[in-house]
């Protein structure tokens, strides 16, 4: 059986949540972002592991329903927030029926909220009001944010003023200071007529880089999954653990003669007799086709781990690695990303970010859950 697999580590998710909480004041709550099927990790595996988060954030109604189904199966009730809000009046009404919190970022959503209100004791009676402080993606601009807030509070709603850092991964970027200043000013203005208004500004990068801006809620995303949220420190330096291991196996081994080429377009050729292995994964599984300088982890017959170069072109179902001088057997497991190499390292080689690699994995690899990592071996 082809053994390409995605292994999710719930213990790593739980550990990362604790690391995030250790950065916060005790009163600051964590909204665990589980949109896009929990960044490719799977709602069913992720939500139970993150059950000690204060709530869950999703992008759309179908994701909210999936999270609710898992929570219902655990007999647990937690806030679920639609961070893009309702996409129609009908969705707004469904959100009220299921008590999903909603973000409001444009006038039409505001109109729905004013015309169709939930009960005062529902969680969804607290609106996550989005303020565009500089990302220019979603949210009310400077000239509308206060009037939108006033309309909602006059109607009896509670508010969480929300914005999103554009450059929090780069602590020195000048836009950060401008966004913080705008957010603080708007929050102060709103609290004049609605003193109980809460604030939520920080994503994963903001949690680590702007500890004085945590306010009442943080929205933790990529850090929960063990990937690096900031530019100047690795995930390991932040004590984050990878929550996903992508693995395959050695499916063939060949000894090339000098001058033999491999793969499509013959991009790599042996300069002398050379041993290579074929690995059972490709872009049909979601592994990136272009990975300049990427390595994989392979264990030799003595149990020692080695980082081996990918050579030639990644195809739909397989690619080749350089194992010259190593004693490697067919069916040996190959780690594409996990503890080493990390997904951040692979993303850099692919010219993208870890988020995309997590989310682009296809349904072909089998999925499994493992509470602990395999015993670690030192690299040779």
Predicted regions: what they are:
Residues 23-25:
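Terminal domain-start leader segments
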Residues 5-7, 14-15, 28-200, 214:
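Active-site-proximal beta-alpha core segment in soluble small-molecule metabolic enzymes
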Residues 2-10, 14, 63-65, 86-89, ...:
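Active-site anion/phosphate-binding pocket segments in diverse small-molecule metabolic enzymes
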């Amino acid at each position: 059986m082809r053994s390409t697999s995605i292994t999710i580590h719930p213990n790593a998710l739980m550990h990362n949540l604790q690391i995030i909480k250790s950065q916060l004041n005790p009163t600051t709550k964590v909204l665990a972002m589980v949109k896009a099927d929990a960044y490719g990790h799977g709602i069913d595996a992720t939500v139970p592991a993150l059950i000690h988060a204060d709530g869950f954030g999703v992008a759309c109604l179908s994701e909210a329903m999936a999270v609710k189904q898992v929570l219902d199966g655990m007999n647990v009730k937690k806030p679920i927030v639609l961070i893009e809000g309702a996409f129609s009046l009908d969705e707004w009404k469904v959100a009220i029926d299921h008590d999903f919190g909603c973000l409001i970022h444009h006038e039409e959503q505001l109109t729905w909220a004013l015309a169709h209100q939930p009960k005062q004791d529902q969680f969804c009676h607290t609106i996550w009001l989005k303020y565009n402080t500089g990302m220019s993606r979603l949210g009310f601009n400077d000239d509308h944010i206060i009037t939108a807030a006033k309309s909602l509070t006059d109607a009896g709603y509670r508010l969480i003023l929300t914005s999103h850092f554009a450059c929090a991964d780069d602590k020195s970027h000048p836009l950060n200071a401008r966004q913080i200043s705008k957010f603080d000013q708007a929050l102060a203005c709103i609290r004049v007529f609605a003193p109980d208004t809460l604030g939520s500004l920080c994503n994963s990068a903001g949690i680590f880089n702007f500890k004085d801006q945590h306010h009442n809620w943080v929205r933790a995303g990529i850090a929960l999954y063990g990937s690096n949220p900031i530019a100047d420190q690795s995930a390991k330096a932040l004590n984050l653990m990878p929550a996903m291991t992508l693995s395959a196996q050695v499916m063939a081994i060949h000894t090339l003669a000098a001058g033999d080429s491999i793969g499509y377009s013959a991009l790599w050729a042996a300069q002398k007799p050379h041993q290579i292995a074929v690995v059972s994964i490709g872009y049909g599984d979601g592994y990136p086709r272009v990975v300049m300088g990427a390595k994989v982890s392979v264990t030799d017959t003595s149990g020692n781990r080695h980082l081996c170069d990918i050579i030639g072109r990644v195809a739909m179902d397989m690619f080749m690695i350089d194992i010259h001088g190593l004693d490697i057997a067919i069916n040996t497991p190959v780690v594409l990303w996990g503890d080493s190499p990390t997904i951040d390292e692979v993303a850099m080689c692919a010219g993208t970010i870890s988020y995309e690699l997590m989310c682009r994995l296809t349904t072909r690899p089998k999925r499994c859950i493992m509470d602990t990592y395999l015993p670690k071996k030192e690299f040779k």
